[in-house]
Amino acid sequence: SGRGPDVAATGLRMSRRAAVLALGAAVTALGGCGLRLGKGSPASLPSASQAETTRDGLARQAALISSTAGVVAQAGGTDATVAPLAEGVKQTADAQLETLGGVWEPWASQVPSSYPTAAPVPSASADATVQDLATTLGDGSTMARRAAIGAASEQDTRLFTALTVAWSLQHDLIVPASSADTPRVDVAQGSRISTGLLTSYDAARYAMEEIAARSHDPQRTQAADDAKAATSVVNAAVAAGSEDTRLGAYAAPTESSTPDVSAQVSWARQVWSAIVSAEVQEAGSAKASTPAREAAVTGAVDAARRATAWGADFSSLP
């Protein structure tokens, strides 16, 4: 499929890391700490920071998702519509694993059996099912959400938020969401949002109201629901004292950016995709473990689901 809205282009693009605690760093750490590597003296495992431990945990989950998706894609009884979805999940998970820095390998090569080692990388059983894939994606989105809310680094926060969005959307492709998430306004608990994010939500509100007025069901109902959701965020943000500079947020596209797609649908994709990018930025700017951070992560997932419902593609995340 074609590339979807490039969330990376708004601040998510990050330099590729070497493998977590890679050989050079591990050897340096071992030497600097004076750990004994001599005969009869098994070395201790190098210690990892909390940030590296979190990344490693997510990398292991990405590896498990890739493994599970690979089994499902190749299984003989897999539904013809599910197999390509599973293959797409596998390819994306492989890229996510690389972005996360890979799974930590403590030693450069085979070492004596007396040396401690890290836990093996998890992998799927040979009879893994579609439900197993849905479970690994659901678990992954929960892990990534918690990591995003608690991350100390702005860069990590944005990466983990994008990962939360990606795994949530992929889970929805396999098993459609049975119930809506807690609304952003409830999670925010009266916290303010940035001017840019407020403007993005207000642009979405206006666009959805216009689209609803010009459309017939079921598109009218979808647009009206989206307008209500965006309005609730705008009203709550203004009530909380967020700076309000919304002039110029209402420009409609003169034509569709995608062939065979109406200008209205293209507009809907545009405004909700812009909110995904703005929420990811907001998450990085908010303090760790606060309602504002949690609300931004929640808002990113919700906006991505709304954009996807209009046909936007986020397969390139993170």
Regions from the language model: what does each represent?
Residues 1-9:
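N-terminal secretory signal peptides that target proteins for export/translocation
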Residues 8-10, 24-25, 29, 34-318:
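All-alpha RGS (Regulator of G-protein Signaling) helical domain and cognate RGS-like helical scaffolds
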